[in-house]
Curated annotation (Swiss-Prot):
Residues that coordinate or bind ATP: 601
Keyword Kinase belongs to the record: no
Gene coding for it: ileS
Entry GO MF terms: aminoacyl-tRNA deacylase activity; ATP binding; isoleucine-tRNA ligase activity; tRNA binding; zinc ion binding
Protein name per the record: Isoleucine--tRNA ligase
Keyword Metal-binding appears in the UniProt entry: yes
SUPFAM superfamilies assigned: Anticodon-binding domain of a subclass of class I aminoacyl-tRNA synthetases, Nucleotidylyl transferase, ValRS/IleRS/LeuRS editing domain
Catalyses which reaction(s): tRNA(Ile) + L-isoleucine + ATP = L-isoleucyl-tRNA(Ile) + AMP + diphosphate
Keyword terms, alphabetized: Aminoacyl-tRNA synthetase, ATP-binding, Cytoplasm, Ligase, Metal-binding, Nucleotide-binding, Protein biosynthesis, Zinc
GO biological process, one term: isoleucyl-tRNA aminoacylation
Free-text remark on how the cofactor is bound: Binds 1 zinc ion per subunit.
InterPro entries for the chain: aa-tRNA-synth_I_CS, aa-tRNA-synth_Ia, Anticodon_Ile_BEm, Ile-tRNA-ligase, Ile-tRNA-ligase_type1, Ile-tRNA_ligase, M/V/L/I-tRNA-synth_anticd-bd, Rossmann-like_a/b/a_fold
Length: 915
C-alpha cells in the first residue's frame, strides 16, 4: 500500500488567491436575480439622478412593432443602444433613452383578424380596434420582458406607445400643424396599392422580390396612316385598358422602320437592334421622324374605341423597350406627371381589390392578374401583339401580405415634400448631420432627392384617423384648421375612439356646413394615418415641438431605416421645427446565420435570442457577442460564434477571478504614490492608462468590436500571460506587508476597478457581480470611467522594450530546452545572457522575476549543464541547470541547502505567527 503524499509544511504560509467569486458563471440562472436587484434599488433612475447636473446625452429609440417576441435582430439593436447609454453614463453624461413601441398598423390588424377567424366578418370597427389595442398591449409587455432579460436599463414607467391616448392626440396635433402650414393635401394620384389588403402602401412598406411578368410588344395604329404603328413594350398588360397616351423623349432620335411581318413600326433608333433580338423580327429603316412628326400623330387603342395622344418626358430612356412608352396616368408616377401636365384624366378602371370596374366593361369583375393572359389573347386576336415572352425582374411586394403591389390612382392624403422648399432645406440639413457609417449620407440624400410626395392615408381600421369629413349631399371632402383644432381638444379629453363612437356633428365645431352646398349633414371619413407618420412624430411626443428644440443626440437603427424612420422623422421635424430630429445617425446591418444566409423559418436557421442563447448561456454572452461584431455591416451568428464568445468570456472571467483573489476595494484606500511602486507595476499601470484612454475613445465612436479586442488582449496577454506570471512569486511568497507585494496588490486593485468600469456597458451582470465581490457598496453604474493620466509615462515604454524583447528570446530558448527533454518548469532553469547588459537596467533578481526563471547571469563562465542555447536579437541566450537547490516554499532554485527554505522565504516564515 502506497504511503499518502506528505503535505508540504509551508503550503499554509503561501498567500494563495482567495475569493468567493465563482469560476462557473451560471449566468442563465443568476442574471434574473440581479435584474430584480437593479429594479428594487432603482439603479437606472439613480444613475440618472446623480448625474442630473451633467451634460445630457439623448438616444431616441425607434419603436419596434408590438407584434411577436423580439428576434435576434432586435437584440442586436437594443443591446447596442444599451451599451451606448451605459458607456455615456460612465463617461459622465446624464443619459436618457425612452423605449417606444409602434402599436398601430397592418401587422397587428392582420394578426387580430387572423385570430378572429370567421368571427372577423361580424366584428365592427370599434370592437376590432379594441382587440388590436389588447393585442398590442400584450406584446408590449412581452417585449418589455425581453428588454429586461437582455440586461437593458430602462424605466418601465416611462415608455412611449403610439396607441397611448396622449400620443394619439399628439399625432393629430402634428398633422394639424402640418395642415396649417400647407404641407397636407388630398389628391387622386397613383400610389403603391395592395389588392390583397385593400390599402395604400408607403415606400418604406415595400419589399422587392423576384417576380415573373408577361413581356409584350404591342402595336398602336397611327390614325390616318395605312399599316403604320407605334411599337410599345410593357410588362403590365392589365394596365392597357387605362392607356391614354404614348410617351417619347425629345432628346432621342426616332424612325419609321419596315418590319417583315408587322408593317411599318415607329421606335427609337437606339433600340432597333435590341427589339430585333428580343422579338425575332427584322427591321429596315425607312426614314427618320422629327419631334414635330411625332407631335402631330394620334394613335388608336388596340382593342378599345379610344385614341391615345403623343407626349414627351425625360423618363423615357434606352434602357429597355422601344423608346415609345405606354402611358396610363392612373397607374404610374411618371405617367401621372406627364399625363396631368397635358390635361389627361387619371383613369384607373380597377377597384380596391384589383377587379376591373365598369370603366372596362368587357372584363368587369375580373382580377387584374387573371386578366393578363386574357388581354394578351385579345391583342393577338386584334393582330396587335408583336411578341410575347415571360420576364423575371425585381418587383415591389407588400411587406405584410408578401404579394405583388400595383400602382393605382385613388384619392389619398399626401404630405408635400416640395412645399415651402422643404426638400431643398432637408438636403441642406442632412449635410450637417453626422452619418455613421459615412456612406449613410449618400444613401439618404439620394432617397430624399428622388422621393415622391408621402402618401399618408391608409384604408384600414387600426390607426389614428385622419380627421376629415365628407358631405353626404355633394360628396365634398371637408377639412380645415378649425375642424382639426376642435377635434384635437376632444381627443385630449376623451381619446381617439370618439371618432368611431360618436356622430360627425359631435366632432365638428358648431354650425359647421359644407362649403360647397351648405349642407350640415357630414360623415366621418374612414382613412387612417400611415403608421410611419405615427413613429415619425415620436420626437414631438417625447421631446416637444418648439422651433429650435434641441434634437436627439443619436438615432440608431438598421440600415433599412434610411428609407423608413430616418425619413419619416425628418420631414415633420424640418417642416415644423426647421431642424432635423437628430444630430447623429448610426446604422447597423442585418443578423444572418453563420453561412451568411438570412434567417427564416423555412430554412430552419432562426436563432431565438432568449431560448437559444440567454436561457442556455446567459445574456452577458449575447451582449459580449454583440460587442464582437463590426455591426455597421451585416453580422453572423450561430453555435460556433457563440462558442467562441463563451470561451472569450471565460478568459475575462478568470482574469477577474484572479484579481479578486489577490486584492480588494480596501486596497485602493492605500493611495500609493507613483514613487512607491515598483517599475514593473508602474509599467502595467501605464499600459492600463493607455488602454483606458483608447477604450473611452472607442466607446465615443461606437467601435465596440475594438473595445472587445483591446480588453480581451489586455486580459489574456498583458495580464494573464505576462504580468500575473511576473508577480506570481511576490504575491504568493513575499511578506504580506512587504513593499513589493503591496506595490503589486495595489496595482491589481487599480486594474480591477478600471476593468470593471470599462466592461460594465457590455458585461453588465458580470461587472456588477465583480464590483460587489470587490467590496464596493454601490452599483458600478454609479461610477465614472477612471482618469488615469497620473499613471501615463511613455519613458517606461522605452525602458521596458528591451526587457520584453529579451524575454521573447528567453522563451524561445526555454522552449528549445523543453523539446530536448531537459526542462520542465521554467523555474528549474537559470538564464545566461551574453551581451546587451547595458540595455537591461534591472538587477539580475528583477530580471529573473520578469522571465519567471530562478537566476539571470551575464557571464558565460560556469560548470552547470547547458540545456539549450538560442541566438536572438538580444544576443546569445543559454539555458542552464541552476547551481542552487529548489526552495520547498516558492519552488525557485535559490536555496543554498537542499530541502531548506531560501533566504527570503525563511525570513517570511519566521515572522509568521505559529497560529
Amino acid at each position: 500500500m502506497a504511503k499518502p503524499e506528505t503535505e508540504n509544511p509551508y503550503s499554509k504560509t503561501v498567500l494563495l488567491p482567495e475569493t468567493s467569486f465563482p469560476m462557473k458563471a451560471d449566468l442563465a440562472k443568476r442574471e434574473p436575480g440581479q435584474i430584480k436587484v437593479w429594479k428594487d434599488q432603482k439603479v437606472f433612475l439613480n444613475m440618472k439622478e446623480i448625474r442630473k447636473s451633467k451634460p445630457s446625452f439623448v438616444l431616441h429609440d425607434g419603436p419596434p412593432y408590438a407584434n411577436g417576441n423580439f428576434h435576434v435582430g432586435h437584440s442586436l439593436n437594443k443591446i447596442l443602444k444599451d451599451i451606448i447609454i451605459k458607456s455615456k453614463t460612465l463617461s459622465g453624461y446624464q443619459t436618457d433613452m425612452i423605449p417606444g413601441w409602434d402599436c398601430h398598423g397592418l401587422p397587428i390588424e392582420v394578426q387580430v383578424l387572423k385570430n378572429l377567424g370567421k368571427e372577423a366578418r361580424n366584428t365592427g370597427p370599434s370592437e376590432l380596434r379594441k382587440k388590436c389595442r389588447e393585442y398590442a398591449a400584450e406584446f408590449v409587455g412581452k417585449q418589455g420582458e425581453d428588454l429586461n432579460r437582455f440586461l437593458c436599463f430602462w424605466d418601465e414607467n416611462n415608455k412611449y406607445l403610439t396607441m397611448a391616448p396622449e400620443f394619439e392626440a399628439r399625432i393629430v396635433e402634428v398633422f394639424g400643424s402640418l395642415f396649417a402650414k400647407g404641407y397636407i393635401y388630398k389628391g387622386k394620384k397613383p400610389v403603391y396599392w395592395c389588392i390583397d389588403l385593400a390599402t395604400a402602401h408607403a415606400e418604406a412598406e415595400i419589399e422587392y422580390q423576384n417576380h415573373v411578368s408577361p413581356s409584350i410588344y404591342v402595336k398602336f395604329a397611327v390614325k390616318g396612316e395605312t399599316d403604320t404603328h407605334c411599337l410599345i413594350w410593357t410588362t403590365t398588360p392589365w394596365t392597357l385598358p387605362a392607356n391614354l397616351a404614348i410617351c417619347f423623349n425629345e432628346e432621342l432620335p426616332y424612325s419609321l422602320f419596315q418590319s417583315d411581318a408587322h408593317g411599318r413600326l415607329i421606335l427609337a433608333d437606339g433600340l432597333k437592334e435590341a427589339v430585333e433580338q428580343k422579338t425575332g423580327i427584322t427591321l429596315t429603316k425607312i426614314k427618320s421622324l422629327s419631334n414635330a412628326d411625332l407631335k402631330q400623330m394620334v394613335f388608336l387603342h388596340p382593342f378599345l374605341d379610344r385614341e391615345s395622344i403623343p407626349l414627351f418626358g425625360n423618363h423615357v430612356t434606352l434602357d429597355a423597350g422601344t423608346g415609345c412608352v405606354h402611358t396610363a396616368p392612373g397607374h404610374g408616377t411618371d405617367d401621372y406627371r406627364v399625363g396631368t401636365a397635358a390635361g389627361l384624366p387619371t383613369l384607373s378602371p380597377v377597384d380596391d381589390y384589383g377587379r376591373y370596374t365598369d370603366e372596362f366593361e368587357m372584363m368587369k369583375g375580373i382580377k387584374i392578374w387573371d386578366a393578363n393572359p386574357k388581354i394578351v389573347e385579345l391583342l393577338r386576336e386584334k393582330n396587335a401583339l408583336v411578341h410575347f415572352s415571360e420576364f423575371t425582374h425585381s418587383y415591389p411586394h407588400s411587406w405584410r401580405s408578401k404579394k405583388p403591389l400595383i400602382f393605382r390612382a385613388t384619392p389619398q392624403w399626401f404630405f408635400s415634400i416640395d412645399h415651402n422648399g422643404l426638400r431643398d432645406e432637408s438636403l441642406k440639413a442632412i449635410d450637417k448631420v453626422q452619418w455613421i457609417p459615412d456612406w449613410g449620407i449618400t444613401r439618404i440624400r439620394s432617397m430624399v432627392e428622388s422621393r415622391p410626395d408621402w402618401c399618408l392615408s391608409r384604408q384600414r381600421n387600426w390607426g389614428v384617423p385622419i380627421p376629415s369629413f365628407t358631405c353626404k349631399s355633394c360628396g365634398l371632402t371637408h377639412l380645415d384648421d378649425k375642424t382639426i383644432q376642435h377635434f384635437i381638444q376632444i381627443v385630449k379629453k376623451e381619446g381617439i375612439e370618439v371618432w368611431y363612437e360618436k356622430e360627425a356633428k359631435d366632432l365638428l365645431p358648431a354650425d359647421t356646413k359644407c362649403s360647397n352646398c351648405g349642407s350640415e349633414d357630414l360623415k366621418q371619413d374612414k382613412d387612417i394615418l400611415d403608421v410611419w407618420f405615427d413613429s415619425g412624430v415620436s420626437s414631438f411626443a417625447v421631446f416637444g415641438d418648439s422651433i429650435g428644440k434641441e434634437p436627439a443626440d443619436l438615432y440608431l437603427e438598421g440600415s433599412d431605416q434610411h428609407r423608413g424612420w430616418f425619413q419619416s422623422s425628418l420631414w415633420p421635424s424640418m417642416a415644423i421645427r426647421k431642424t432635423p430630429p437628430y444630430k447623429s445617425v448610426l446604422t447597423h446591418g442585418y443578423v444572418l446565420d453563420e453561412k451568411g444566409h438570412a434567417m427564416s423559418k423555412s430554412l430552419g436557421n432562426v436563432i431565438n435570442p432568449t431560448t437559444d442563447i440567454i436561457n442556455q448561456y446567459g445574456a452577458d454572452i449575447l451582449r459580449l457577442w454583440v460587442s464582437t461584431q463590426d455591426f455597421r455591416d451585416d453580422v453572423k451568428i450561430g453555435k460556433d460564434s457563440i462558442k467562441t464568445v463563451s470561451e472569450a468570456y471565460r478568459k475575462i472571467r478568470n482574469t477577474f477571478r484572479y484579481l479578486l483573489g489577490n486584492t480588494s476595494a480596501e486596497t485602493l484606500t492605500w493611495n500609493l504614490k507613483k514613487e512607491e511602486l515598483d517599475t514593473i507595476d508602474k509599467y502595467y499601470l501605464h499600459k492600463l492608462a493607455k488602454l483606458n484612454d483608447e477604450v473611452k475613445k472607442l466607446y465615443d465612436t461606437y467601435q465596440f468590436h475594438q473595445v472587445y479586442h483591446k480588453i480581451l488582449g489586455f486580459c489574456t496577454v498583458d495580464l494573464s500571460q505576462d504580468y500575473f506570471e511576473i508577480i506570481r512569486d511576490r504575491m504568493y511568497c513575499d511578506a504580506k506587508e512587504s513593499k513589493t507585494r503591496r506595490s503589486s496588490e495595489y496595482t491589481l486593485a487599480v486594474i480591477l476597478e478600471v476593468l470593471s468600469k470599462l466592461l460594465a456597458p457590455i458585461l453588465s451582470f458580470t461587472t456588477e457581480e465583480v464590483w460587489t465581490s470587490f467590496g464596493k457598496k454601490d452599483s458600478v453604474f454609479y461610477s465614472d470611467f477612471s482618469d488615469l493620466t497620473e499613471w501615463l509615462d511613455e519613458s517606461l515604454e522605452s525602458k521596458m522594450k528591451p526587457v520584453f524583447e529579451t524575454k521573447e528570446d528567453v522563451q524561445k530558448a526555454l522552449e528549445e530546452a523543453r523539446k530536448l527533454g531537459k526542462l520542465g518548469k521554467s523555474l528549474e532553469a537559470e538564464v545566461v545572457i551574453d551581451g546587451k547588459k547595458d540595455s537591461l537596467p534591472f538587477s539580475s533578481e528583477e530580471l529573473a522575476l520578469f522571465f519567471v526563471v530562478s537566476h539571470v547571469h551575464f557571464e558565460t563562465n560556469g560548470i552547470q549543464e547547458v540545456f539549450s542555447e538560442w541566438k536572438g536579437e538580444s544576443g546569445s541566450i543559454q539555458i542552464r541547470k541552476p547551481k542552487h537547490f529548489e526552495c520547498p516554499r516558492c519552488w525557485r532554485h535559490v536555496s543554498e541547502t537542499e530541502g531548506k527554505l531560501c533566504k527570503r522565504c525563511d525570513e517570511v516564515v519566521s515572522k509568521l505567527s505559529p497560529n
